[in-house]
Amino acid sequence: MSVEEKVLELIRPDDKDRERLEKVAEEVLSRLKGFDAQIQGSFRKGTWLKGDTDIDIFVFYPKEVGKEYLREKSLKELIQLFQDLNYEIAFAEHPYLILKINNVEVDVVPALKIDSGEDVITAADRTPFHTKFVTTHLDEKGKDEVRLLKQFMKGIGVYGAEIKVKGFSGYVAELLTIYYGNFRKVLESAKTWKPPIKLNLVEPKRDFDEPLQIPDPVDPKRNTASAVSLRNIAVFSLASKIFIERPSIEFFFPTEIKAEEIIGDILLIKVEFKEKSVEDIIWGQVWKNVEKLKNAIKTAGFSLIDIGAWGNSQTVKIAVQIEDKNISRYYLNQGPYFYVNGVDNFMRKNKYVWVGEDGRLYSLKKRRETNLEKIVLNNLSFKENFSVEMTWLSEINQDDKELHKFLRKRPTWMQT
């Protein structure tokens, strides 16, 4: 039995799985009588994975009611229908409901009914056209090929188009399978990818500038892969190359290996948000803060090894790994050659100045700050109310899986 066959046995849902989700979907749809309510997403397309316990139900309104109706009145209508259930309000382009029924998560999403994927008023409006395109281009074998690709992406950590992950969406996995034909062919091509990667199921109706470009077959002005970061493209390409050479179930279900040592000095920053917020909004700010911290730490004179972030919309951890937290108060500042314009300015601005053997002027400059905690506090900012707790890592929390990944660096699938 091949690796793919073994994996399919683990990820292909059976009749019992399907019946369980169908029962929940029927309960929700029964409350939406009188509305144009439809099951959408991977469950409808037949590309969902065993163990996935979420269903997308879209409630379509006439496009004439407009976006404002979805933002205000539709939510009130839906809450009234489901107020006796365990629900929460979530936000994307407009609010929607998340229901929890028998350990199944149901997203009830209002959208506008449009004539084609190019007539979108909100991003959710395209969904039925995506569903139709995928279901008309994939047979049952093709759906299994998508399942393999999704699980492979999950296993190597590049699955999910949300801002936190910046990876491949389920729809992109489906389009890749349709474009190349099957899971193996996707990987065979991906191992040789070099940005910009242009995969045209349809001709694009505008130019894209992202590293991976897959125009949406239902709206060719849109790049379906715009969310995928260069890092995740690199990880997927490298993992594809290694899998083709040495197939292993490790790519799909990686072994959790504990980190054994702390290399360098690591400052662990724990950010707690006082109010609940939208995860995409939080993580958009997290990554901006990470970039800001990178620049500030390097500018301050620390040798930065790595910086990583993990968590959710309530608690975020940022790990800063540097070679040494103790740096000198002064540093060598290289100036111009003696015959270059700017010598006078350099001498005027610096106190400890001398001429080097190479004919350049040099000076000693005092660092503005040598305390990394203060640098972090001065550069960390969020729109939400938050608190910060910082500790220098002296021992490894055995329960923090993401910390172990950060410390270990090398993923388990990266065989030599």
Swiss-Prot record:
Binding sites annotated in the UniProt record for ATP: S42, K45, H130, K150, Y159
Which catalytic reaction applies to this protein? a tRNA precursor + 2 CTP + ATP = a tRNA with a 3' CCA end + 3 diphosphate; a tRNA with a 3' CCA end + 2 CTP + ATP = a tRNA with a 3' CCACCA end + 3 diphosphate
What does the entry list as the binding residues for Mg(2+)? D54, D56, D107
Co-factor(s) = Mg(2+)
Enzyme class, spelled out: transferase
Signal peptide segment? none
Note the subunit structure: Homodimer.
- What's this protein's name? CCA-adding enzyme
Species of the source:
Sulfolobus acidocaldarius (strain ATCC 33909 / DSM 639 / JCM 8929 / NBRC 15157 / NCIMB 11770)
